[in-house]
Amino acid sequence: MKVVIMAGGKGTRMLSIASDIPKPMIPIEGRPVLEREIECLCEQGFTDILITVGHLGNVIMDYFGNGLKFGVHITYYFEKKPLGNAGALFQVKDQLTDDFLLLNADAMFDIDFNRFVQYHKTHDAVATLFTHPNSHPYDSGVIIADEHMAVRKWLAKEDERPEYFKNRVNAGLHVLNKKILEQTVEGGKIDLDRQLLKPLAGTGQMYCYDSPEYVKDMGTPERYYA
């Protein structure tokens, strides 16, 4: 199964920590967070990796190369201009397997990806989201699901929310089917959450995978140091 890791963002919120390297290369105990992601994937047999890069992407490409010394095979898609966090998917569609993993590049995790993928296949889903509670639901996409774990509503950060809601957020780890790229999306920059995933809410094609497994987002200095 192909793994796509999104590493093309500028990481503007992390400039106070590292302005000369991309966010996925920020070290955790001496090793880049992206290296730790790749190590976790490799240990579970996910070795076919495509990394989308943009801002300071040469730093990532120079460090990981073809992935051989990390036990994986890595190819790259370099965004010459910003495409949004999902725009590159349409450019590499022909390189994807029918189902593929799509991961943010700035998270620490220790999860069973094979079980996650099997859950997706069992539900014959177009999209499956790894969901969990976190410390900042106000700054995250909140997911509301039915009793079968099908996603009914996706509440983005800017959406009005009920007074009380379950702290269930999208962790930035997904199993997707290529069918999701058959949608017609307008605009030069494509937002994964708002333009590809959110429209699937309520259709019975997107499920959430609630799990207590370890996932830590490194998206801000506060979360990095926590």
Model-derived features with residue positions:
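A structural signal for short hydrophobic beta-strand segments in well-ordered beta-sheet cores
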Residues: M25, I143-A145, L197, C208
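Catalytic-core segments of class I nucleotidyltransferases/pyrophosphorylases
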Residues: F46, F100-L101, M108, N114-K121, ...
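Structural beta-sheet core signal
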Residues: I5, I51, L102, A127-F130, ...
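Residues at the starts of beta-strands that form the adenosine-phosphate
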Residues: K2, T47-I49, H73, V126, ...
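Alpha-helical elements of Rossmann-like donor-binding domains used by nucleotide-donor carbohydrate transfer enzymes
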Residues: R36, C40, V59, Q91, ...
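Glycine-rich phosphate-binding loop at the start of an alpha helix
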Residues: E35, A86, D193
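Conserved beta-loop-beta/alpha segment of the NTase-like Rossmann-fold superfamily
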Residues: M61-D62, N66-E147, Q183
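N-terminal glycine-rich phosphate-binding loop and ensuing alpha1 helix
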Residues: M1-M61
